[in-house]
C-alpha cells in the first residue's frame, strides 16, 4: 500500500443563524473556499444551530448546493452537522459528508445527552469516512465522553478521529481532555470543531476553542472562542 499523503485539515466554527439552513450553508461554503484545506470539519448541528426541533435535513436538499459547489471548486471534503431523517419518520443527530459530487449521511450520533433523547433517535454504530487514503472515525460531542464509542470506531481501523461539538465555555477543558485521551488511547490525531456564538438548547454562550491534536496530545492548532475562527494543521502519516 502506498504511503498516505499529508492531509490538510481545518476545524471551523462559522457564524450560525438559528434554523436558517440557506444562510448557514452560505457561511459553510465561504469557510470552505477560504480554508485552503482538503478536509473542513464543522460543529455539531452546524447547519441549523443547536435547535432541537429543527426539521430533518435531507442530503438531497437543494439548499446544500452552494456547499457542494464550494467543495467542487476547492477540492475539499466537508463534514457538517445536521438533524438527519430516518426511514419511517423521526430524526437522528449526525454528520453529512459533502464533496463536489453531493452530500450523503456519514454518521448518526450514538451517545445522546441532555434533552436530545426526547427529540432524536441514537445511532447504532460507528462511522468512517475515507479521504485520500485516510480513514476518519466520526463522532459528535457526547460521543467523545464514551470510551466505548471511540473503541468501536477505532476497531474499524482509523487514522484520525474527527468530531463536531457544542459545549459551554466551562466545558472547554473537558473537551480538550477527551480529545487528548482519545488520541493517546488509540494512537491517532484528533480534530474537534466546536460551536462558537449563541445558539439554542440553552446555550446562550458556547465554548468555541476548536482544535487539532496530535496522537501524543500535542496541540497542533487551536481557535479562540469567537465565531468565524478556524484552526488549521497538516496531518502526516
For the regions a language model picked out, list residue spans one by one.
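Short hydrophobic-aromatic micro-motifs
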Residues: 40-41, 135-140, 162-163
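Short glycine/acidic-enriched loop and turn motifs that connect beta-strands
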Residues: 17, 85-87, 197-199
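CN hydrolase (nitrilase-like) catalytic-core segments centered on the catalytic cysteine
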Residues: 63-79, 145-228
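Beta-strand-turn-beta hairpins that frame and shape the catalytic cleft
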Residues: 2-9, 128-137, 160
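N-terminal glycine-/serine-/threonine-rich phosphate-binding loop
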Residues: 1-39
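Conserved beta-strand and immediately adjacent loop positions that scaffold enzyme active sites
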Residues: 8, 94, 209-210
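Cys-nucleophile CN-hydrolase/nitrilase-fold catalytic domain and related Cys-dependent amidase chemistry
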Residues: 26-100, 169-188
Amino acid at each position: 500500500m502506498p504511503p498516505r499523503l499529508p492531509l490538510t485539515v481545518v476545524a471551523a466554527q462559522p457564524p450560525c443563524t438559528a434554523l436558517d439552513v440557506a444562510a448557514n450553508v452560505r457561511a459553510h461554503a465561504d469557510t470552505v473556499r477560504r480554508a485552503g484545506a482538503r478536509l473542513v470539519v464543522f460543529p455539531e448541528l452546524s447547519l441549523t444551530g443547536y435547535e432541537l426541533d429543527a426539521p430533518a435535513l435531507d442530503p438531497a436538499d437543494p439548499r446544500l448546493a452552494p456547499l457542494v459547489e464550494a467543495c467542487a471548486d476547492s477540492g475539499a471534503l466537508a463534514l457538517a452537522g445536521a438533524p438527519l431523517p430516518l426511514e419511517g419518520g423521526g430524526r437522528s443527530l449526525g454528520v453529512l459528508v459533502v464533496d463536489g459530487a453531493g452530500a450523503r449521511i456519514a454518521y448518526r450520533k450514538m451517545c445522546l445527552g441532555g434533552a436530545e433523547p426526547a427529540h432524536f433517535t441514537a445511532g447504532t454504530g460507528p462511522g468512517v469516512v475515507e479521504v485520500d487514503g485516510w480513514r476518519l472515525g466520526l463522532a459528535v460531542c457526547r460521543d467523545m465522553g464514551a470510551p466505548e464509542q471511540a473503541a468501536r470506531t477505532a476497531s474499524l481501523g482509523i487514522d484520525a478521529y474527527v468530531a463536531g461539538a457544542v459545549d459551554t465555555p466551562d466545558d472547554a477543558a473537558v473537551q480538550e481532555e477527551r480529545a487528548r485521551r482519545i488520541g493517546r488511547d488509540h494512537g491517532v490525531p484528533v480534530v474537534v470543531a466546536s460551536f462558537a456564538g449563541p445558539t439554542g438548547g440553552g446555550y446562550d454562550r458556547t465554548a468555541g476553542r476548536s482544535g487539532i491534536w496530535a496522537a501524543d496530545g500535542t496541540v497542533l492548532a487551536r481557535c479562540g472562542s469567537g465565531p468565524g475562527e478556524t484552526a488549521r494543521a497538516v496531518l502526516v502519516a
